[in-house]
Design a protein with these regions (language model features):
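Signature of the SF2 helicase/ATPase Hel1-core->accessory helical subdomain module
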Residues: 293-362, 499
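Short, positionally conserved secondary-structure boundary motifs
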Residues: 576-644
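N-terminal pre-P-loop "Q-motif" helix
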Residues: 172, 187-215
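Conserved RecA-like ASCE ATPase "motif II neighborhood" in helicase/translocase motors
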Residues: 264-320, 471-474
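C-terminal accessory regions
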Residues: 326, 472-476, 480-574
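Accessory nucleic-acid engagement/destabilization modules that flank
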Residues: 1-163
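Conserved helicase/translocase motor-coupling segment
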Residues: 231, 336-341, 355-374, 383-501
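Conserved lysine of the Walker
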Residues: 227-228
Length: 645
């Protein structure tokens, strides 16, 4: 700060100008290095935002608004200083009603006091941000003084800093209107059936919520039930209603992908400010947000921060930070040892926070070709849950097994040519060597000469929609919560078939995989083995349900491949079933009078289920009514369902 002290030693900079160092922006954990407030020559309120950097050099990147520079831990990508300063000013303008109402002018810039001017920071690719927030360099102390004096002529006699810190928080109409216009007509975010029920229920709870009447909605749903579709619609609608809301997720990938899809004409920072990680609420004042929409809530942790040493409980902290919280959760997608956010724990925590709680379930299946049967078959085959879905038909879902990983890759690449919505993914059984050595490959299967790199840092969290990322292989962290048309899955040696059992082997995971690190600490061997089995099987269940139209698989363990093949319906079996004559069924009435329901008639459901236990996400809908005879007294709990087997 000594550099700024020297800058401010100018008689024409008013001594009573407002100064703030390390100012924390409301709604965020972001801090502005240096702020100067005052009035310009016509008595208008002014705020100069200065981003300070100690850098002495930087490198270009091919990513928007990013440069590379050296930190203590080495060279890494970071935001361009002008982008940072501009983004802070934009965030305040977008969400501070007082700043907008009183027309307080925010003027950002950057000061790199150790940096000799070159063609990197001022490169034309950064021009949009340099125009908004000019950078000043080692030799520009005089220019920075003139810049400050241009905007701050008189001292701060109007408590401008107080208005920024304590002003009314409300998203701007421009931000809301732009967001709504981007969602309109976007087929990807149209809600159907029970998605609409959850959406309207959530809005009703949001309207009821207040600081002393917290509302918590817990929405359970399996893969492809549209949890994220509802979440994004709620984010847009609450912003349209000028409520302070945010989409929250533990993983960066869903945030980055949905933000990119919604960006449209908005500048990147404006849309990204509406998305945040789950580890930023441990010091957020109570009820700062009107609404927090938590997607993939099963991934929430206890501790936050890079070293997991901040905060106490992300579920409790999120509930405390908002008047209303909507949690979207799938209890079968816990894939990390530190994941705590199952529905039971969320409900228990919400009760301890004295919140009003409602629970709903999304059941309609939009992924996996709309087949609940595929999910139930998968649970049965992975031996997660016993269901009656022993065999899988190609009519249910396009599931194929490949004996050669190269053929699998070629098939996925061919599928991807249509719309860039097919990718290869794998279990984390291979070290990420290419992170340090760009020439190295990661996922290697020597018997077939197969070699691919894990998803590179180039696309980062948006790997799944990257233009050229088809040539890289993704892992659970870059695809969970997102969907593809076709998923090519490589199942590593951490999942095997032995003695009639699908077994897991945590020792086959990469040593770089943090999801199972420390699994033996504080647990008996049996407890550790049980948890490892749950995490590994949940990981593959998640990978195997990313494809909406098809899933193609290669197994490193050949006994496991043979076992999976045995669970597929053979073509001759299918032909045998199809050749049977259609039985004459009873007459189905579309509707009957209420006075004969459950007296003479029982409801018929559409689900053609195997006899036995149904999968958790298998749902039935009423198709009509059938008259019954010889069954004795009927009750309202009875129904008719067509069964195969």
């Amino acid at each position: 700060m000594s550099y700024m002290d020297r800058i401010m030693e100018d008689p024409d900079i008013p001594a009573d100008a407002g100064i703030s160092i390390e100012f924390q922006i409301p709604l965020t954990s972001k801090r502005i290095d240096f702020i100067i407030t005052g009035l310009n020559e016509v008595q208008q309120e002014q705020v100069v935002i200065i981003e300070l950097k100690q850098w002495s050099s930087a490198e270009l990147t091919d990513k928007d608004a990013l440069v590379k520079t050296r930190f203590q831990h080495g060279v890494s990508e970071t935001a361009h200083p002008s982008y940072q300063a501009w983004s802070y000013a934009t965030l305040i303008k977008d969400y501070n009603q007082t700043v907008r109402d009183e027309q307080i002018t925010l003027t950002p810039c950057a000061y790199l006091h150790n940096y000799p001017k070159d063609q990197i920071i001022t490169n034309p690719r950064y021009e949009p941000y340099i125009t908004e927030a000019p950078p000043f360099f080692q030799s520009d102390a005089g220019k920075l003084r003139e810049f400050i004096k241009k905007y701050v002529k008189y001292g701060d006699s109007k408590d401008i800093l107080y208005k920024i810190e304590n002003g009314r928080l409300r998203p701007s109409k421009q931000l809301a209107d732009n967001l709504v216009s981007m969602l309109k007509g976007n087929q990807e975010f149209i809600m159907l059936d029970d998605q609409k029920v959850v959406y309207e229920t959530a809005l009703s709870m949001i309207r009821k919520a207040s600081a002393d009447k917290k509302q918590v909605l817990i929405v359970k749903g399996g893969p492809g039930t549209g949890k994220s579709v509802v979440a994004i619609n709620l984010l847009v609608e609450t912003t349209r209603n000028r409520l302070v809301s945010r989409y929250v997720s533990k993983n960066a990938a869903p945030r980055a992908v949905y933000a990119a899809k919604l960006a449209g004409t908005l500048r990147k920072n404006q849309i990204y400010n509406m998305f945040g990680g789950s580890g930023t609420f441990y010091n957020t004042p109570a009820n700062t947000f009107d609404v927090l929409i938590v997607d993939e809530a099963h991934r929430l942790n206890q501790k936050s921060g890079l070293f997991q040493n901040q905060g106490e409980d992300q579920v409790r902290e999120i509930i405390g930070a908002a008047k209303c919280v909507i949690f979207f959760v799938d209890d079968h997608q816990r894939v990390h040892i530190k994941d705590i956010g199952d529905s039971a724990y969320i409900e228990k925590t919400a009760r301890s926070c004295h919140a009003s709680i409602k629970k709903l379930e999304l059941s309609s299946q939009f992924r996996c070709n709309g087949s609940d049967g595929y999910l139930a078959w998968l649970d049965n085959t992975l031996q997660i849950n016993d269901t009656a879905n022993i065999r899988l038909s190609q009519d249910d879902f396009d599931f194929r097994i490949f004996s050669d990983p190269n053929e699998l890759r070629k098939t996925i690449e061919d599928k991807n040519k249509t719309n860039n919505k097919s990718r290869m993914v794998a279990g984390y059984c291979w070290d990420w060597k290419s992170k340090r050595n760009p020439e190295a490959t990661d996922v290697n299967i020597p018997d077939f000469g197969f070699a691919m790199k894990w998803n590179l840092e180039k696309d980062g969290s948006t790997w799944i929609i990257g233009e050229n990322s088809i040539h890289e292989i993704g892992c659970i962290h870059t695809c969970q919560g997102l969907e593809l048309d076709y998923a090519g899955v490589i199942i590593g040696n951490d999942l095997r078939y032995e003695n009639g059992k699908v077994v897991t082997d945590v020792t086959k995971r990469s040593r770089m995989d943090s999801s199972v690190k420390g699994i033996k600490v504080g647990r008996t061997p049996a407890q550790a083995a049980q948890l490892a089995e749950e995490l590994i099987k949940n990981t593959y269940r998640t990978l195997l349900t990313r494809g909406m139209k098809g899933c193609y698989v290669y197994f490193c363990d050949k006994p496991l491949e043979n076992y999976f093949r045995q669970q597929l319906e053979l073509p001759q079996e299918k032909a045998k079933v199809v050749s049977l004559p259609e039985p004459q069924g009873p007459r189905i009435e579309r509707e009957v009078n209420d006075d004969v329901k459950y007296i003479d008639y029982l409801p018929l459901y559409t689900l053609k289920a195997a006899c036995g236990k149904f999968g958790e996400w298998q749902q039935a809908e009423e198709e009509g009514w059938i008259k019954t005879e010889g069954m004795g007294k009927l009750t309202s709990g009875m129904f008719i369902v067509q069964a195969n087997g």
